[in-house]
Structure formats: structure tokens, C-alpha cells
A protein has these predicted regions:
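Non-heme Fe(II) oxygenase catalytic core, chiefly the N-lobe of the double-stranded beta-helix
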Residues: 1-143, 148-179
Length: 179
């Protein structure tokens, strides 16, 4: 996922530090969305360059099996109204394009939801290939800083019933709306 993509002004950077780690598992994977974009076929770049996606925390929780209608009040649901974000962003400093993917995407604008999700899932699968990834194996006191504008990340499984893991995260707000 990408941190806070469901907010009107998405996160710029995130920092994660390890206070206590699991003995097995619990790695964090980062995918470079710049290189993923660069390696796409031209026809795919042309297709996605102007796409707009709806992001919401509700979408990502539903994908995990949560029934958000039962678990949230109507006021809480209003707080997670989908936010439109471009599927492709351009870094103003480098002029380099990047795919702005996240598990918080629930729909591509003007597409039906099933087609949207199939397309997004295929794009995520492509963009998270090993050739685009850095896998961090945690040590105590590690601090990782990443740019949410050009990466996706995910934590890998560990035995949270048997192991105590203490990770501290800070998220830096972005500077502007993307749309």
C-alpha cells in the first residue's frame, strides 16, 4: 500500500523504526514505482497516464474481509468518503513519472468496479515484481525513511501470537492535493 493515499493530501514521507523485532518474518518490502512505470509498455503508459482512481480506507479494509458498514458509524463512514487521486504522478523536481498505486484504491473513474479492480490488481502484481523491490530485514534500532510519492510497501507475516514486535511509525504530510 501507500500511506494515506485515501487523504486529500496524501503522505509525503514515512519513517519506521524497530524497537523490538520478530525472530522470523516481519520483513518490509518496498517497490519502486518509478522503475515500474518506466518499464511499462508505451501503450500501457498512454492508457494510465490520465486515469483517476478513488481511494478510501474502506476499500482496503473490505479487501481484507471487514464489514465496514457493520463496524463503522455513519459519521465514521463519511470520514472515509473516497478521494480521487491520479494513477500516475510526476515528480516536480525530476519530472519523472511514477505509478501511484495503493490497496486503498477501490475504483477507476468511469470504470465499473470489477473491471477497475482486475486492472489495478494486475498493475500491482506487475509493479511489485522482485526486480522492483527492496526487502528490508529488520534489526533492532533500524530506521527506514521512504517516499510515499514513489514507493509502495508492505509488511510480511510473522507469528504475532508468539512474538512481541514493536515498530514506531511517523508519517509526514504531503504539501498539496494531487487533483
Amino acid at each position: 500500500h501507500t500511506d494515506s493515499s485515501f487523504k486529500k493530501i496524501p503522505a509525503k514521507y514515512s519513517l519506521l523504526s524497530a524497537r523490538n523485532i520478530s525472530k522470523v518474518g516481519g520483513n518490509t518490502e518496498f517497490a519502486d514505482m518509478r522503475n515500474a512505470y518506466d518499464s511499462l509498455e508505451i501503450k500501457t503508459k498512454d492508457k494510465i497516464d490520465k486515469m483517476i482512481c478513488e481511494h478510501s480506507l474502506i476499500y482496503s479494509r473490505q479487501r481484507l474481509g471487514f464489514d465496514m458498514v457493520k463496524e463503522l458509524s455513519s459519521d465514521e463512514i463519511k470520514n472515509f468518503t473516497p478521494v480521487e487521486q491520479p494513477l500516475v504522478r510526476k515528480n516536480k523536481a525530476t519530472n519523472r513519472k511514477t505509478i501511484f498505486l495503493s490497496s486503498h484504491i477501490g475504483k477507476i473513474k468511469n470504470w465499473i468496479r470489477p473491471d477497475s479492480m482486475c486492472f489495478i490488481d494486475d498493475l500491482i502484481e506487475y509493479s511489485t515484481q522482485l526486480k522492483f523491490k527492496y526487502i528490508h530485514e529488520w534489526s533492532i534500532n533500524d530506521l527506514i525513511i521512504w517516499d510515499n510519492r514513489q514507493t509502495m510497501h508492505r509488511a510480511r507475516a510473522y507469528d504475532d501470537l508468539k512474538e512481541n514486535r514493536d515498530m514506531r511509525r511517523t508519517t509526514v504530510l504531503g504539501e498539496e492535493k494531487l487533483i
